[in-house]
Curated annotation (Swiss-Prot):
Encoding gene (name): bcrA
Cofactor: [4Fe-4S] cluster
Any Pfam family matching the protein: BcrAD_BadFG
Catalysed reaction equations from the record: cyclohexa-1,5-diene-1-carbonyl-CoA + oxidized 2[4Fe-4S]-[ferredoxin] + 2 ADP + 2 phosphate = reduced 2[4Fe-4S]-[ferredoxin] + benzoyl-CoA + 2 ATP + 2 H2O; 3-hydroxybenzoyl-CoA + AH2 + 2 ATP + 2 H2O = 3-hydroxycyclohexa-1,5-diene-1-carbonyl-CoA + A + 2 ADP + 2 phosphate + 2 H(+)
The protein's name: Benzoyl-CoA reductase subunit A
Amino acid sequence: MECFVGIDLGSTTTKAVVMDDKGQVLGRGITNSRSNYDTAARVSKLEAFIDARLSLIRRELDKEPAVAGRVDEIIDGLTRNFRREQFIEQLGDLEQTCVANVEGPRFAGKEKAIVGALTEVFRRLREEEADKLFAPDAQRKSDFFRDLAGSRFMQIGEEVARANGVEFDHLLHMYDKSIIEVENRPPSADMNRKFRSAMERVRGEMSSALDTAALGAPIDAALEIDMSERYVVGTGYGRVRLPFPKEHIRSEILCHGLGAHLMYPKTRTVLDIGGQDTKGIQIDDKGIVVNFQMNDRCAAGTGRYLGYVADEMNMGLHELGPLAMKSTKSIRINSTCTVFAGAELRDRLALGDKREDILAGLHRAIMLRAMSIISRSGGITDQFTFTGGVAKNEAAVKELRQLVKENYGEVQINIDPDSIYTGALGASEFARRAVVEA
């Protein structure tokens, strides 16, 4: 099976989409962009091919009468247990790297104790935490290895350090130094072994409720399908750093416009708010860009701004929207500048304003800035599509809907659950057209 890949290298996350020769999306992958763009591109592409393999497995399972009505449950189990296999593999890599980094005069005479403490920390992570993180009902705030391993390493590391008379700072130093090395080494691409191990765990989880023998043939058939990468197109904030020839690079404006058109063919106006920029794009009925505007010079009012606000308030980025939705009044925020955001935020808190009201004001300020950019690009024409990571923020969406109605009346607003992949989707379609329509 020939596959066409689009990679969108953003300032905070890198996304990839795998498409077949008919234009059908097979898989999507995402990772944090890191300092090494080459690695981010490889990891996101690997993640997209993993997701594509799961799509093929789903197709084969849909043909099997014995698992009718249970396919979603089986795919969920395979996905969870595949991620568990990946997590354990990367834990092993992280442990070896941490142990190898226990050297130098700072640790002289303490090496054995530090290595012993590290060994115990990683034993507990493997034997106690892996099953909890990937249990059927587990709620994970992130799927990135750094986040999953880091939070548990800190807690267990403190306990082990106290019990073994080792300075916790030494363990923390090992982790901080080693996680960068591990992140810049993509996980092994040995998908088949991991899927087969995951399948055995799914059989154990579902053995009392399902003829698990029926799982083997469909999954084996899907794993045997050869998926070959025919053409790749890269786009995004860091596209000039992608390891591709010039002819394999496309503007992020073109890719977002085409991607939005593929999601919603009647789209005429696109707003994309990403980690580093805000784009207002006008497209025609074929997805061709006819006009656009972007934020100038700085990252004010973008995802990076929200990330800075989250850090200032000691919250997770995903918590900002839900808290802002609890607001009873919106406070006027004078600046969406990242540099001054902290100062104004602290001033508002000192005046006694509630955090949720401040956040509501911040979200409105962001969307007012976005509306200004859209206006300069030509305004909003029905239909209107909102894309990018900020499109997952419910408070931002609420403010956008209100502002659109106030300024343009009743307009259909499209927000796809996978809107963060819009640029990568457009890039994958450019890759497909480069071959199929050549």
